[in-house]
Amino acid sequence: MKKYSIIYADPPWAYRTYSKKGQGRSAESHYPTMCIEDIKALPVGELAAKDCTLFLWITFPCLCEALEVLTAWGFSYKTVAFVWVKQNRRNDDLFTGMGYWTRANAEICILATKGHPKRVDAGVRQVILSHIEEHSKKPDEARERIVRLMGDLPRVELFARQSPEGWDVWGNEVECTAHLPMEETPCCGYGL
């Protein structure tokens, strides 16, 4: 099985909604989601090279669960790699999303490691200011910054929505070029 020095993941976190209005905007109304236990059960650690960096997109309500996920996958939390401050689609104003307490307009990508990976560029910045696109799509700039930070190493994107050059991909919206070693679920199926 191919091993990767960079794993980039944007799991389809399931959320509890508190109103009918929120149900129409939730992730579940856009794509299949997964509960935390199913995300934790994915054998992501088996894809990791001896020295590997994990970049994991999370939303603030899932922060504690995300830390459980990276531990279950065999990684140790290091820092927040990126803070995506979202701008509206049509102008440069800040996007105002939903939120359980305050109106959310940022998401974070945490960085975790297995072994002792080394960064190659100390000038990569944390804040990404960019426009939102389709629901939950992350800015392409994040991938570019990951390669600048860690180098042109074997890399895979999990839960991918596109197939960027230089990346192996796994997800239910792409033709998979990477495979998770699972007996019960075929590649790219989230129906665990």
Specify the residue positions occupied by each region the protein language model found.
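Class I S-adenosyl-L-methionine-dependent methyltransferase catalytic core
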Residues: 1-192
